[in-house]
Amino acid sequence: MSDFLPFSRPAMGAEELAAVKTVLDSGWITTGPKNQELEAAFCRLTGNQYAVAVSSATAGMHIALMALGIGEGDEVITPSMTWVSTLNMIVLLGANPVMVDVDRDTLMVTPEHIEAAITPQTKAIIPVHYAGAPADLDAIYALGERYGIPVIEDAAHATGTSYKGRHIGARGTAIFSFHAIKNITCAEGGIVVTDNPQFADKLRSLKFHGLGVDAWDRQSGGRAPQAEVLAPGYKYNLPDLNAAIALAQLQKLDALNARRAAIAAQYHQAMADLPFQPLSLPSWEHIHAWHLFIIRVDEARCGITRDALMASLKTKGIGTGLHFRAAHTQKYYRERFPTLTLPDTEWNSERICSLPLFPDMTESDFDRVITALHQIAGQ
């Protein structure tokens, strides 16, 4: 229907169009100076020394794991309540994903669950900053330091998120997403931040065929036209067309996230009169980026299942999302790990629903969602 309200929509405007035109007019549309500008700007946001732009957060996760030397027989700890790309990258490298449970009310991976899963084969810990809220980094990094295990933060939801006064990423290595539904977007893209120069160099090489330089380096730096392969790599570089859009979006980040926060506050107020349960907020000091606004639909409490609620909202022209179906319940992973049970993850996976939340959402859009929820709840 023409008036369908999606659960997410990118906030694009004249600034993004102008940024694209500038790149097209420049004659250099693939990886180049706009990537360098984006990386520098993102370092200013997070406080890191290095940033490496990539074609997606999935690509960033892949090469970050490779740069750590993750391979056959290694174990990587991550929550099952995450997008499956992280698990896929672990498996494709020959390593074993060790999926752990999350807090029932915040859906955050807990240090207790992580520590219980650590073995001599554990080579990385990947906490997820879920829905725009931060995981408990002090406790998680303390575990990493105690056991000598690197931490890679999955910050796909966390552009604009802070933990105890510091932007996500400032503690070490984090991977952000610029996918179309994220807080800032360039259609597809991502960025890895780190303070380790050797790690950053490995990422730059792995993202571009294993070469020590990219096409812009050779064009602008007067280097030899044929660089050497240092180790086999991939084609994960971000075109300047995308980087320019991401830069324009980054300049709007505070305003975009402020609007998200305002809508989330309205949702919280409205939910007081409805049976649907929003996620609880973490107890530690933080700034929430409000990538998603998630409710839990428990049939015993709400009189309707989550799937029925989503179907009913769809008939009313309102879109919703599911973030996420637990990874260990997906066909490949449930067959590979048939005895794995994660009670709090599974309880939530069957009940969570993402409501519409995006910066261009109007008051009328919001009222429409709340009216529909009241109708479904029989109020």
UniProtKB/Swiss-Prot annotation:
Requisite cofactors: pyridoxal 5'-phosphate
Key words, A-Z: Aminotransferase, Antibiotic resistance, Lipid A biosynthesis, Lipid biosynthesis, Lipid metabolism, Lipopolysaccharide biosynthesis, Pyridoxal phosphate, Transferase
Which SUPFAM superfamilies did the record assign?
A: PLP-dependent transferases
Q: Catalytic activity annotated for this protein?
A: UDP-4-amino-4-deoxy-beta-L-arabinose + 2-oxoglutarate = UDP-beta-L-threo-pentopyranos-4-ulose + L-glutamate
Per the UniProt entry, the Enzyme Commission number(s) are 2.6.1.87
Pathway given in the UniProt record: Nucleotide-sugar biosynthesis; UDP-4-deoxy-4-formamido-beta-L-arabinose biosynthesis; UDP-4-deoxy-4-formamido-beta-L-arabinose from UDP-alpha-D-glucuronate: step 2/3; Bacterial outer membrane biogenesis; lipopolysaccharide biosynthesis
InterPro entries from the UniProt entry:
ArnB_NH2Trfase, DegT/StrS_aminotransferase, PyrdxlP-dep_Trfase, PyrdxlP-dep_Trfase_major, PyrdxlP-dep_Trfase_small
Residues modified to N6-(pyridoxal phosphate)lysine: K182
Locate the transmembrane regions by residue number: none
Q: Does the keyword Lipid biosynthesis apply?
A: yes
Q: What class of enzyme is it?
A: transferase
Q: What GO molecular function annotation could you give as one example from this UniProt entry? A: pyridoxal phosphate binding
Gene Ontology cellular component terms for the protein in this record:
membrane
Tagged with keyword DNA repair: no
Extract one GO BP annotation from the record: lipid A biosynthetic process
| Cited function | Catalyzes the conversion of UDP-4-keto-arabinose (UDP-Ara4O) to UDP-4-amino-4-deoxy-L-arabinose (UDP-L-Ara4N). The modified arabinose is attached to lipid A and is required for resistance to polymyxin and cationic antimicrobial peptides.
Which NCBIfam families does the entry link to?
Answer: PRK11658.1
Question: So what family is this one in?
Answer: Belongs to the DegT/DnrJ/EryC1 family. ArnB subfamily.
Q: How does it assemble?
A: Homodimer.
Protein name, as recorded: UDP-4-amino-4-deoxy-L-arabinose--oxoglutarate aminotransferase
Species for this entry: Salmonella newport (strain SL254)
Instruction: Name the gene.
Output: arnB
